[in-house]
Amino acid sequence: MTILEVGSQLIESAVLQMSLTSVLLTASVFTLTLGYFSKLLFTQHSSEHTKYPPHIPSSLPFLGQAVAFGRSPIEFLEKAYEQYGPVVSFTMVGKTFTYLLGSDAAALMFNSKNEDLNAEDVYARLTTPVFGKGVAYDVPNPLFLEQKKMLKTGLNIAQFKQHVEIIEEETKDYFRRWGESGERNLFDALSELIILTASRCLHGCEIRSLLDERVAQLYADLDGGFTHAAWLLPGWLPLPSFRRRDRAHLEIKKIFYNVIKKRREDTEKHDDILQTLIDATYKDGRPLSDDEIAGMLIGLLLAGQHTSSTTSAWMGFFLARDRALQERCYSEQKSVCGEELPPLHYDQLKDLSLLDRCLKETLRLRPPIMTMMRMAKTPQKVGEYTIPPGHQVCVSPTVNHRLQDTWAERLDFDPDRYLHDNPAAGEKFAYIPFGAGRHRCIGENFAYVQIKTIWSTLLRMFDFELVDGHFPPVNYTTMIHTPHNPIIRYTRRNTQPQQ
């Protein structure tokens, strides 16, 4: 083993054991050693006619608020809102972040154009090694929008009607292994199930049939590219997780290339997203290359996997904590679908209104992404303030979803709140788990179908409860805010649904 390999493994081991605060600190030191200390010499001077957002002071040069923010980001932002108002700036690791807190301030981001508030400058270094070149944030925004439109074409109601049957079948097959009762890691189980269901629904039967333990590990290695280290540290570092990510990317693309090649040679047309992409063309008439199709398939799967697995797990723990609510959801299955609980149909999902409200409330209290970011390319006016170019402009769904100004009993899990006055109806950006405006997630409708089908099936199969009253805290060390120590207790229901 070379000195370089030993060194990279030591760095990797350290990063894996770090909190967000520690990673930020390490990134700070690393950045300084690379010569970015010169940023300290840059001072932004306000003209007498320009008012910049209030800036939270720090006694730590360069690091700024990295320690305080990394320790407890939501509480940090809520305190900043109370002290400074809806627009506030602070420095971390030599970069200035400006948060737009609340519905009115958030409108700036969601109504913005990409040439003013740019997404590629923020996300490309994180997504390109995972999805590949030529797709998503690696291409000019107009091209990315064309790619999103192609994917959205394949996410339609006709497809969703087929997906319900597929997802129910996959869920039953997966959870048969759980036996009659026990305690299991709910998040891990749902993460695996989401990959299986999404692969079959979105990639097609050929790719789903290849999803064995080896391919599942490749997906896990690719998914390991979404870390604080990948966001903050240069991608060329020889960290073991970076090398695993890069190897997995190449291996998965090889698998996709073979499937795409066979599809192109097949005279029979299939009805799935893979076929949609094979048949699609850009506005200039150019068809998608195999590499672009493979990259878009990877992006579609992994982007949705995070949202659905995290949200599904949190929803399970909220229902396990409130047993009466869980029983109401189970009773709703019988009242909507039939006392004998026959197989689900797409048209029934919209009538499961209580389950829908439970999902909506889960997304309010535990939106999978804490912060949405853009890079300011031009001066941006918000209220009385001007955000200068170079600031990373951020909106936090988590904060918007629990502001006292908007939400009564803001920390309570109360699905029935949507039966009464719904703040999200009066404030356009008070509820934004999937973004909003031109930045809204294209997979939102599929996520609702997927999660509601999974939980309809699980409620029919099991009764859930917390283990000794333990409700998981939020794990802030990950890019997606997952439940920490997500063990749940379950007992299989005596009533067996019809097959």
Swiss-Prot record:
Q: What is this protein called?
A: Lanosterol 14-alpha demethylase
| Listed GO MF terms | heme binding; iron ion binding; oxidoreductase activity; sterol 14-demethylase activity
Q: Where in the cell is it found?
A: Endoplasmic reticulum membrane; Membrane
Q: Tell me its family.
A: Belongs to the cytochrome P450 family.
- Establish whether keyword Metal-binding is in the entry: yes
CDD domains in UniProt? CYP51-like
Reaction(s) catalysed by this chain, per the record, are: a 14alpha-methyl steroid + 3 reduced [NADPH--hemoprotein reductase] + 3 O2 = a Delta(14) steroid + formate + 3 oxidized [NADPH--hemoprotein reductase] + 4 H2O + 4 H(+); lanosterol + 3 reduced [NADPH--hemoprotein reductase] + 3 O2 = 4,4-dimethyl-5alpha-cholesta-8,14,24-trien-3beta-ol + formate + 3 oxidized [NADPH--hemoprotein reductase] + 4 H2O + 4 H(+); 24,25-dihydrolanosterol + 3 reduced [NADPH--hemoprotein reductase] + 3 O2 = 4,4-dimethyl-8,14-cholestadien-3beta-ol + formate + 3 oxidized [NADPH--hemoprotein reductase] + 4 H2O + 4 H(+); a 14alpha-methyl steroid + reduced [NADPH--hemoprotein reductase] + O2 = a 14alpha-hydroxymethyl steroid + oxidized [NADPH--hemoprotein reductase] + H2O + H(+)
Predominant localisation class: endoplasmic reticulum
Task: Tell me what controls its activity.
Answer: Inhibited by ketoconazole. May also be inhibited to a lesser extent by propiconazole.
Q: Which cofactors? A: heme
TM region(s), chain numbering: 13-35
Give, as in the UniProt entry, the pathway in which the protein acts.
Steroid biosynthesis; zymosterol biosynthesis; zymosterol from lanosterol: step 1/6
> Which EC number(s) are documented for this chain?
1.14.14.154
Tissue expression remark: Strongly expressed in intestine. Moderately expressed in liver, with higher levels in females compared to males. Also detected at low levels in brain, eye, kidney and testis.
Q: Which gene encodes it?
A: cyp51
Concerning SUPFAM superfamilies, the annotation shows:
Cytochrome P450
Q: Which GO terms describe its cellular component?
A: endoplasmic reticulum membrane
UniProt keywords (A-Z) are: Cholesterol biosynthesis, Cholesterol metabolism, Endoplasmic reticulum, Heme, Iron, Lipid biosynthesis, Lipid metabolism, Membrane, Metal-binding, Monooxygenase, Oxidoreductase, Steroid biosynthesis, Steroid metabolism, Sterol biosynthesis, Sterol metabolism, Transmembrane, Transmembrane helix
Organism, as annotated: Danio rerio (Zebrafish)
